[in-house]
Amino acid sequence: EVQLVESGGDLVKPGGSLRLSCVASGITFSGYDMQWVRQAPGKGLQKVAYFNDALSAQGYADAVKGRFTISKDNAKDSLYLQMNSLRAEDTAVYYCAPWQFEYWGQGTLVTVSS
């Protein structure tokens, strides 16, 4: 059974930082290009960041570029998202998923509010 478990979400003030984690089990993690996506209240899914395993390349949505950093540790079957300079508009449930969206976790809630 494939499981993706996200954690690290919290209530944080604007300008603060959080580090999200996603731990995978049941898949060969090193074979997957992974991404973080988010769903803000009342809105659709938005791709936030991706990590291309073969190239060790990263890409970011314009809204988070320069503030968020994605990283992947295949030895720990883990994906991370370092989030700095958080804004109210970053409030959302954050999910990790393979590039083709084969699997989903339960998500972790990030709330940015003063």
From Swiss-Prot:
This is Ig heavy chain V region GOM. This chain was isolated from a myeloma protein. InterPro entries: Ig-like_dom (IPR007110), Ig-like_dom_sf (IPR036179), Ig-like_fold (IPR013783), Ig_sub (IPR003599), Ig_V-set (IPR013106), IgHV (IPR050199). Coiled coil: none annotated. One of its GO terms (cellular component) is immunoglobulin complex. Keywords: Adaptive immunity, Immunity, Immunoglobulin. Residues 1-112 form the Ig-like domain. The keyword Lipoprotein does not apply. One of its GO terms (molecular function) is antigen binding. One of its GO terms (biological process) is immunoglobulin mediated immune response.
